[in-house]
A protein has these predicted regions:
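Cytosolic, long alpha-helical scaffolding segments
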Residues: 1-156
Length: 156
């Protein structure tokens, strides 16, 4: 679909912006893939009637999920309005979120080492946290490349 879309543009635009178009498609595809990788292990875990996440894991991830949802909503609004002003705020928020998610992984690894809880549940949780980090990263990367794609051509 990318090649068909670019065929409709003039050659100068394709040369100037084609890379950003393909990068945007890649980031959007990776974003969707990460969301499915986040959900699939959870669904399989539930379908197999394995133990649920413990209260600590639920609380930690719930807080992070709210922040991720807010980031995605803000980015969606900016994309829809083609408004990339103050994008640094979203970039900072994404960096903070990825730091929080890294901390969640470290905490979970410490819980595994102290042998508290189920290893199977911990593996599902670690997968969720890792894929949540990917969602945050790909969301911001999509924003950055979209901004580059939409920018007016600047001649030196």
């Amino acid at each position: 679909t990318g090649t068909v879309a670019l065929c409709r543009l003039d050659n100068n635009t394709v040369l100037e912006k084609g890379l950003y178009y393909y990068q945007g498609n890649d980031f959007a595809s990776e974003l969707v893939y990460s969301i499915s990788r986040l959900c699939e292990p959870c669904l399989e875990h539930i379908d197999n009637n394995f133990n649920p996440l413990d209260a600590i894991q639920k609380g930690e991830f719930s807080d992070a999920a709210e922040d991720i949802t807010y980031l995605i909503q803000q980015c969606r609004r900016k994309l829809e309005n083609n408004d990339y002003n103050n994008m640094e705020e979203e970039i900072r928020r994404a960096n903070d979120l990825n730091g929080q998610l890294s901390l969640l992984k470290r905490k979970e690894l410490q819980r595994i080492q102290s042998q508290s809880g189920s290893i199977r549940v911990s593996m599902v949780y670690l997968t969720m946290v890792q894929e949540a980090q990917n969602v945050v990263t790909y969301t911001i990367n999509l924003m950055k490349v979209s901004r580059k794609f939409q920018m007016e051509t600047e001649m030196p």
